[in-house]
């Protein structure tokens, strides 16, 4: 985090305390208290927002009249942790990371952050969508199969990922990215509550769960685990080549 209110007056950087999805929900609940919101008609979210929605259902069921959960499972899977820790490694391996103390040095780990974004963005899109949009075509005006590797151009999908990386670098801090990605790795609604099935089966918040059959990051198996154990639930299956959240 680039907030400059640490005890020593310097940027927090990578020294900022680790946070969890539950920490985020506690902060949201405190904000709701300040705003005078006692109960929500619906709490809705996808991916990290879906993880927070699940925690709202478990932590503050009396404040949630209904919930909508998209693209998330009851806990981070080995596959998801693998995707996400690889993104973190891309950032922390950048020499400009400087052990997370890069703020104010004039050097930021933008290369690592861009690689992390490319990795993440591949997990956000389905194989079918990428093939339909790009296949193995070259980027406009470029030749990716030239004989000289130092001079060759890009494939269309490379150009697309470069664009997504460039957009994120201009608006996001690398320490924030690491902190939030680590929070997703920690996601587990059953931790300290008797296990996933127990906490789901005792939840009384009515919920709609949406599952996309082409989602490579949050597969149907995980979504169906929620559906199998939540007592007040509607499950919606979406067959869609494009992941839209």
Question: Model-predicted segments: where are they?
Answer:
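Single conserved hydrophobic/aromatic residue that forms the stacking wall/gate
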Residues: 1-3, 236-245
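Acidic catalytic loop of the alpha/beta-hydrolase fold
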Residues: 214-218
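Short beta-strand/loop motif that positions the catalytic acidic residue
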Residues: 203, 209-211
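Short alpha-helix in the alpha/beta-hydrolase fold that links the catalytic acid
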Residues: 192-196, 219-229
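Short, conserved loop/helix-junction motifs that constitute active-site signature segments
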Residues: 200-204, 229-231
């Amino acid at each position: 985090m680039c907030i400059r209110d640490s005890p020593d007056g310097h940027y927090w950087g990578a020294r900022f305390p680790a946070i969890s999805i539950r920490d985020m929900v506690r902060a949201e609940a405190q904000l709701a208290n300040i705003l005078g919101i006692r109960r929500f008609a619906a709490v809705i979210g996808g991916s990290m927002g879906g993880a927070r929605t699940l925690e709202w259902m478990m932590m503050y069921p009396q404040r949630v009249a209904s919930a909508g959960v998209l693209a998330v499972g009851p806990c981070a899977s080995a596959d998801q942790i693998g995707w996400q820790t690889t993104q973190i490694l891309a950032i922390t391996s950048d020499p400009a990371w400087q052990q997370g103390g890069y703020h104010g040095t004039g050097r930021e780990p933008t290369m690592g952050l861009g690689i992390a974004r490319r990795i993440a963005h591949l997990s956000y899109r389905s194989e079918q969508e990428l093939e339909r949009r790009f296949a193995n075509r070259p980027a406009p005006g470029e030749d990716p199969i030239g004989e000289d590797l130092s001079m060759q151009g890009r494939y269309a999908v490379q150009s697309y990922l470069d664009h997504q990386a460039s957009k994120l670098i201009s608006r996001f801090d690398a320490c924030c990215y690491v902190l939030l990605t680590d929070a997703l790795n920690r996601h587990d609604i059953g931790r300290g509550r008797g296990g996933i099935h127990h906490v789901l089966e005792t939840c009384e918040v009515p919920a709609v769960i949406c599952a996309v059959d082409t989602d490579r990051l949050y597969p149907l198996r995980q979504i169906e685990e929620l559906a199998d154990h939540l007592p007040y639930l509607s499950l919606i299956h979406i067959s869609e080549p494009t992941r839209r959240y």
